[in-house]
Amino acid sequence: MNKIIIRKTEDLKEWRRNLKCDINFIPTMGNLHDGHQKLISTAQSSNCNTNLLSIFVNPLQFDSKEDLKSYPKTVDKDIEIAFSNGADAIFIPNVTDIYPKKNKSISYLKASKELSSALCGLTRVGHFDGVCTVVYRLLKLIQPKNLFLGEKDWQQLLIIKNLIEEKKFNIKIIPVPTQRDSDGVPFSSRNKHLSKSERKSLKLFSNELENAKIIFKKDKRIDLKQLTNKLKSKNISIEYLEHLHPYSLKKVQSNDNISILAGAIKCGKTRLIDHVFLMKRKPIIAIDGPAGSGKSTITKLIAKELNLLYLDTGAMYRAISWLFKKEKIDYAKESELKKILNNISIIFKSNSISQQDVFINNFCVTEEIRSQEISSIVSKISSIKKVREFLVYEQRKIGQSGGLVAEGRDIGTTVFPNAELKIFLTASIDERAKRRKSELDLRGTEEIDFNQLRELIRKRDFEDSTRKISPLKKANDAIELLTDGYSINEVVEKIVNIYNLNIPKEIQLE
């Protein structure tokens, strides 16, 4: 594809009409630095789409004419950087192209009040309205498939995400982690304004945020007042310093696992922002759903894709069911039940074929626990209070440090009610029976009629959803996905996309 520079909206529309593929869009205000280069190269390596970068200094985003006038403009250098890092086309409109004076139909938008009234919105009144207005205009003109945004401007990213949802644009946001210089300072177009002493102040600020993150990892708390006083003692001019929920931007609550420590400082006449994400533990994904909804297969693939531990809680219940059957345990007798539970050891080991083997008391039962014989008794055994208490305790112990994806029937409601992402996977009974039949036929271990399978699944659904202890039900904050008609890979991709929008990339890299 020939590299192209587009300056007029009419030319942009013509170029777009002639395209035979989707667009990856990287909006910028020019003065490109390493952070922008990462956005472009990420877009280029993500797919085979055309990569379009825009350079437009939006006047609606500036607090004063002086601030707008002083913004660095390096168009020739920007063009060179953009093309050398993977941009296929560059859109460089002027103000009248984006905001035609004679066009009275232009919508000047308001940013989400909830998201724009905190942090930068406290002093930069109207700034995010300007962001929403220009982004809306650009998205309507360009109609991209993907939008690449840096997490460095976290509040802006949230506001644009809200705009896309509100306007029902079919556009996927792909966040890119904050890029930092060798001294820990985040790349910013405004860094060029800094003197050596001002750069030193910014470095101190960024380093103190990083130190606070290290302390939080150990203590699970942060003393905002102490940190503020420490920064002031180093002559750092603080505009704001807040510890907030990363998505609502409201004051952090005691049960919030992930939070953001964000601040803005003044270095001379230059205003600069930085943040760090804080975690008490690594993220957890909880996947619940009825038998045959594809939980195990999908959860395994998600764990592999996101480099998370796969916790197959269903296999744990099946393993205990297998052991009870093997040892002929009378689980109606509490004394006998207590004795065997105190001596049970369940561990998972990776292998090259099924990815994970299940061992109970040193017996490898990976294949045995998937038999119809075990399927017919597992619901009854998993409804026993002592069994559930034992396994929930074991599961929570495994999940203490997070970094896992767990599947079962009560993960989001009972085991990990504070999981960062909860998915409720389901499918019609016919679809689930079809999948189960294919699975059994593939193994070639047992013959079973399709209609018989349908009735067994219907019976299992009733037992799971009506049991007194931890019944199968969707958590209030879970996202329900009906998987009929979707391939496994399509469902996995959908959940991974939801995860990427709900867990900052900067956290995923830790």
Swiss-Prot record:
It holds the Pfam family Cytidylate_kin. GO terms for molecular function: ATP binding; CMP kinase activity; dCMP kinase activity; pantoate-beta-alanine ligase activity. Keywords: ATP-binding, Cytoplasm, Kinase, Ligase, Multifunctional enzyme, Nucleotide-binding, Pantothenate biosynthesis, Transferase. The gene is panC/cmk. This is Bifunctional pantoate ligase/cytidylate kinase. Its EC number is 6.3.2.1, 2.7.4.25. Residues 1-276 are annotated as: Pantoate--beta-alanine ligase. It comes from Prochlorococcus marinus subsp. pastoris (strain CCMP1986 / NIES-2087 / MED4). ATP binds at residues 29-36, 150-153, 187-190. GO terms for cellular component: cytosol. The active site is at H36. Residues 277-510 are annotated as: Cytidylate kinase.
